[in-house]
C-alpha cells in the first residue's frame, strides 16, 4: 500500500532532533527522505551515547540510541557540501526534491549556495523549511539555539518544578527535549500546509521555524493566564494552575495522579474516598472555589490517599469514572497492556545484523497507514544508490568523488 506522501521527496540537511524529527514523520507517511550527512562523522547524535545499538552478536555498535530515535525510513547520503563538487550534488538533489529541511544558523547555507533563494532559482516549486533557535529575523537571529536553553529562555522552566519554599524547589527542564519535538511537529504541519498551497498555486515557499517561537506558542493556557492578568504564573510542582484536584498524591506504595476535570467527577471522588461531605462543603462546591481553597483541600486529600496502594485507588476510581493513573517508569510503560495492544514498540532489521527497537508512530490512517520500510540508516549507507539512480552518476564517478573526500 502506498503511503500518503509516497509521491514526495524530502532532502533532509538537518541534524540532531527538531529537523530529523520532522523528516522522520514525513518518512513514516511515505515520503522518500534523503538524509545528507558529513562524510566521516555524520549527524552529531550518532555519537550521543551510551547507550548504543547492539549487533547480532550482542556487541556495541557506533549507532547511538539518540540517533536511532529520529531517523528511520530515511536514506543516508554523505556529501561534503563545503566543497564545490558537493554543493553541485546537493543542488542537483534539491532540483529533484519537493522539500528541503535544514537547521543551520541563519545565513549558514548561503555561503555554499544552498540557501532558499539559490535553490528556488533552480526549483521554484521547492518548499524550504529552515529551523533555527530564534528565526530568520530579530535581535537574536544569529544566535545558536538548543532545546535546554530555549526551555529556560521561553518560560517553560519557570513553570516546571517544585514551588518556592519547598525542599528541592527550583526550575526544572522537561525530561525529553520537548521544544525540539514540538518544533519538529510544527515544522511538519507547516510543510504539509505549504504542499497543499503548492497543489493549488504550483509555487513553493520558505518556512521560517524558530524553537523560541514554538516554545512561547506552546505555553498555551499558562501564557493566557499571564496575558489576561499581568501576573506571571509560578511553579506548582505537579499541580494544575486552573484545576483542583489535578496533581499527584502519595499512596501506601507510591504515587497516584488524580485528574478531576469537573464537579461531577469531584463528587464521585469524594464518595470513593469516604469523604462525601467534601462535595457539599461551601469551599469545594465548584472548581473555581476549589482553586481558591487549594491550600485547604490538598492536605485533606493527602491524608486519605496514603491508606491505599496505588493499584487499589486506580481500580476503585476507574470503576466510577474518575480519571487517574499510576506514575509508570519506562519499563512499566512498554509492558502496559494498552501500549502493547496498540503496538507502540516495534523492531526493524538493521544493516549490522540483528534488530533495532523503535517506538511506533502514533499516526493511524485508515487508507494510507504508516509503513516501516527501513531502520535508521548507517552513515552513507545509500550514497552510491542515490547518486547513481537519482542523479545518473556512474560507478566510476561515485568512486572518484569518494576517493577525493567529497562523499
Task: Locate the predicted segments by residue.
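Conserved Rossmann-fold dehydrogenase catalytic segment
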Residues: 136, 166-177, 199-215, 234-241, ...
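A glycine-rich dinucleotide-binding beta-alpha-beta segment and adjacent secondary-structure elements
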Residues: 319-373
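Aromatic-enriched alpha-helical interface/lid elements that frame and gate functional surfaces
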Residues: 242-320, 324
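Short, well-structured beta-strand/strand-turn elements
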Residues: 33-36, 318-332, 393-398
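Glycine-rich beta-alpha junction loops
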Residues: 40, 134-135, 211-216, 253, ...
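N-terminal helix-loop segment corresponding to the beta1-alpha1 unit
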Residues: 1-190, 194-200, 378, 384-407
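Flexible, small-/acidic-enriched active-site or ligand-binding loops
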Residues: 285, 349-400
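Oxidoreductase and adenylate-handling cofactor-binding alpha/beta cores
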Residues: 162, 184-204, 217-228, 270-277
